[in-house]
Amino acid sequence: MRPSHESAVAAFEQVGTAFIHIAVSTPNLFRFLYLEGYYGSPSDNLDALITNEDNAALIKRISKELSISEENASRYLQNTIIYTHGIATLAATGVINASEKEMMQSVNRAADAFLVQEGVPVKKIPCWEETQK
């Protein structure tokens, strides 16, 4: 899925929402695509999560939008991908049975915390108040 939102952070959230939706609505497809190696061979390091062309462009947009370095934006993206993949994997394998809404709220809270960790002031985080409920 290619994100369509103007805001880089919101576009990234669109991808996370779609990822979790696949895990919940079609767990066998999720397992086939993301857990059984369909999308390529295992990587030697975590940097592989953020080095594809789409993510590199998103990192540049997030960096510019939030006035943080590309390195900080990269760490934010990487941490959020790992967290989202973990939640989606727990859902697809039946370990948790939360609603998509609950899972996205959890992902959004973690993503906001990752932004703060990378030096983004709370007032610059889109929808901070909503995700902290």
Task: Walk through the language-model features, giving the residues of each.
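A generic structural signal for short
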Residues: E6-A8, D47, P126
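Amphipathic alpha-helical packing segments from all-alpha helical-bundle domains
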Residues: P42-S67, S74-Q78, Q105-G119
